A protein has these predicted regions:
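Core hydrophobic alpha-helical transmembrane segments of single-pass membrane proteins
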Residues: 1-6
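Membrane-interface extramembranous regions at the lipid-water interface
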Residues: 26, 165-166
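Localized chelating/binding microdomains
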Residues: 38, 43-51, 91, 105, ...
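A short acidic-to-branched-hydrophobic micro-motif
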Residues: 63-91
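Short Gly/Thr-rich strand-loop-strand
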Residues: 92-128, 168-169
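A short, solvent-exposed beta-edge/loop patch
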Residues: 116-163
């Protein structure tokens, strides 16, 4: 599922700014965490791959799979979103340029109220839609087989403030 993630992590450089933490709450919006689904989709293995390919750049990396079986988008079946995020030393520009450069169908989108940069790639040929954000010290990757890239971008902007928090000193 997020095949470009490992490549993107290796392209990061150093960054700065306010420190943030990424969390995986039990519930975000109408989505509930689905640990069994995370295991079956290989989320922990993907998280480990991102950490390994990051060569020390990715840290505090977390993963979760969220499922919504009751909201409006779930009319034709449960909507699943895989999320992997953490802290990353690097520039948002480098991360997003890497994402859009690797995938010709990728497009830049708004990162939302927390700033930074974001991009998405439509799902094709059985691969899920993917969206990513990066700012001065965090990154997040979302994938969903049930949402198109524009819908997933909207979910990124709504979910990100629920998973990214300023670290209190």
């Amino acid at each position: 599922m997020l095949g470009v993630a490992g490549v993107l992590v290796t392209q990061m450089m150093t960054g700065g700014g306010a420190a943030h933490a990424i969390t995986t709450p039990a519930k975000v919006l109408s989505y509930t965490q689905a640990p069994g689904l995370a295991q079956s989709l290989g989320a922990p293995q993907l998280r480990a791959e991102i950490v390994q390919k990051g060569n020390g750049e990715a840290r505090n990396v977390v993963d979760a799979v969220y499922e919504d079986s009751t909201g409006p988008a779930a009319k034709s079946g449960p909507v699943i979103i895989l999320f992997i995020g953490g802290n990353l030393s690097g520039s948002a520009s480098s991360f997003i340029s890497g994402f859009t450069g690797l995938l010709p169908t990728a497009f830049v989108t708004r990162a939302g109220a927390l700033g930074g940069q974001a991009a998405c790639v439509p799902g094709v040929n059985g691969h899920p839609a993917e969206c990513a954000w990066a700012d001065n010290d965090t990154f997040g990757l979302f994938a969903s087989p049930g949402l198109d890239a524009s819908q997933l971008a909207a979910q990124l902007r709504q979910i990100r403030p629920l998973v990214e928090h300023v670290v209190k000193k």
